[in-house]
A protein has these predicted regions:
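N-terminal intrinsically disordered/low-complexity leader segments
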Residues: 1-6
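An amphipathic alpha-helix adjacent to DNA-recognition modules
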Residues: 7-18, 22, 27-31, 36-39, ...
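Cytosolic nucleotide-binding catalytic cores of signal-transduction proteins
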Residues: 21-24, 130, 151
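Helical hydrophobic small-molecule/effector-binding pocket
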Residues: 76-116
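Amphipathic alpha-helical packing segments from all-alpha helical-bundle domains
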Residues: 104-140, 144, 159, 170
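C-terminal peripheral helix-coil segments that are non-catalytic and often amphipathic
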Residues: 148-172
């Protein structure tokens, strides 16, 4: 896959906060710091993002786009949902280091807000979701389980977590 200059620029900007959060608290990091670390000017940063928190949202968006590109079906049954949950948790485990930095910076609320927005948008396309608050139940479950799992360094088995979450959605 060939990347455009814009995609490369965004990539470097998105990497910048995670590199800097290893050394500094997020609130201490300025847009100038992010731009400098990414090797771009402030104007370039603002061409892509309005504020530094938007970089984290783009990071989540990028992961979702990658995930959706690999997903080949729309879930219709318990097994389909189990496959998606397993894939999401596997991706989360691969991305645990950035999420640890987000958690350490106490910015996990941005992740929860993102999940709520994604699940509520998905509700409109998913005929199996009947209750208007169900997307928030799913988002909250994924958020809380993933954060607790992260606090345990993602030591639990993906299959066990998948079974637990799937059973909560589809009780016997």
């Amino acid at each position: 896959m060939e990347y455009t200059p814009d995609e490369y620029t965004r990539y470097y900007i998105v990497q910048a906060p995670f590199k800097l959060m290893n050394e500094y608290r997020f609130e201490e990091i300025s847009v100038s710091d992010l731009a400098r670390k990414a090797g771009v000017g402030r104007a370039t940063f603002y061409r892509y993002f309005k504020r530094k928190e938007d970089v984290l949202i783009y990071y989540f968006d990028h992961n979702v786009m990658t995930f959706r590109a690999e997903q080949r079906y729309f879930p219709r049954c318990k097994e389909d949902y189990a496959g998606i949950i397993s894939d999401v948790l596997s991706l989360f485990r691969k991305q645990k280091e950035p999420f640890k930095l987000i958690r350490k910076a106490r910015l996990e609320h941005i992740y929860l807000d993102y999940l709520n927005a994604q699940f509520s948008r998905t509700k409109k396309a998913d005929y199996t979701i009947k209750h208007p608050y169900a997307p928030y139940l799913y988002a909250g479950m994924l958020f809380n389980v993933s954060m607790a799992w992260l606090d345990d360094d993602c030591r639990g088995e993906v299959a066990d977590l998948t079974a637990m979450m799937t059973d909560a959605i589809f009780p016997a």
